[in-house]
């Protein structure tokens, strides 16, 4: 089975479900790090906010600005090279300037400085949750490796380079999605969920954003993410032609080595898909800038 190494973030073939590391080298490195951490008991934990640029992250930014959450020691966001243009427009046009007004710098960490953000490995392995047709005609979705590989592992390496020995990592998951909350597998990182702690739902986040007089942020995702709704795909196609062209090009690149793999669940090439947004998707899209 394919798994993500808990140390280096690389995908590997695990012979047993319990395996966490791709090699003895990674396993030994973790053991050595844990031994070193035991020597550092009592080390002050740095507060690190992982910003995603969307609704929940914007609500956290407002709570920080209003003094309802403390200023983090580090505010970080990874640039995986595939994020949508409208996300960066919001981050650079709203989030970063307003955070800088209170002395909080949102650090943008390029994934490419640490790891290859290509959607394909040299072997042809697809790193994103694309779709293919099974032997009996069913739709098969690939596992999701991109988030851990391009974001979490990169953030950890950046923090280590900054000399962070222990971290309290804030994640923007709201109270209505608390099932997504998890505990860290790393001894030096404690995952915290400030919105869950405060009982703030996504609807509450939208109210906070509106009440503060801010423009509502778009839903964040990569322009080539196969898990997008039809509404999101259609929005990209109609309003962000550069992102659309990149997604089409990425699919064609994948199909050079994997001709039966597609970015849309219909198993049809993107340029030929007839997108059919649901009423619920369209109502959600009305929360985002550009369609108001």
Language-model features, listed with the residues they occupy:
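BZIP DNA-binding basic region
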Residues: 1-37
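Nucleotide-activated chemistry modules centered on ATP-dependent adenylation/adenylyltransferase
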Residues: 37-292
């Amino acid at each position: 089975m394919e798994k993500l190494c808990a140390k280096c973030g690389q995908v590997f073939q695990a012979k047993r479900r319990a395996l966490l590391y791709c090699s003895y080298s990674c396993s030994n490195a973790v053991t050595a790090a844990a031994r070193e951490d035991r020597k550092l008991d009592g080390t002050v934990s740095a507060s690190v906010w992982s910003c995603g640029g969307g609704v929940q992250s914007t609500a956290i930014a407002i709570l920080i600005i209003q003094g309802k959450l403390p200023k983090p020691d580090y505010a970080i966001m990874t640039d995986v090279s595939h994020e949508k243009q409208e996300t960066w427009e919001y981050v650079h046009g709203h989030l970063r300037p307003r955070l800088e007004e209170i002395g909080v710098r949102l650090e943008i960490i390029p994934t490419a400085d640490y790891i290859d953000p290509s959607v394909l490995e040299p072997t042809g392995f697809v790193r994103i949750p694309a779709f293919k047709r099974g032997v009996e005609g069913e739709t098969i979705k690939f596992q999701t490796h991109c988030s851990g590989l391009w974001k979490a592992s990169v953030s950890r390496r950046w923090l280590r380079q900054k000399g962070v020995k222990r971290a309290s990592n804030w994640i923007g998951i709201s109270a209505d999605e608390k099932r997504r909350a998890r505990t860290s597998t790393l001894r030096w990182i404690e995952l915290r969920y400030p919105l869950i702690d405060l009982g703030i739902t996504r609807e509450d986040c939208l109210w906070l954003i509106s009440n503060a007089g801010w423009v509502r942020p778009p839903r964040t995702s990569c322009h080539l993410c196969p898990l997008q709704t039809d509404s999101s795909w259609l929005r990209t196609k109609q309003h962000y032609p550069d992102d659309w062209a990149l997604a089409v090009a990425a699919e064609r690149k994948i199909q050079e080595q994997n001709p039966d793999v597609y970015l849309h669940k219909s198993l049809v090439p993107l340029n030929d898909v007839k997108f059919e947004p649901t009423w619920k998707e369209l109502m959600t899209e009305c929360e985002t800038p550009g369609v108001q």
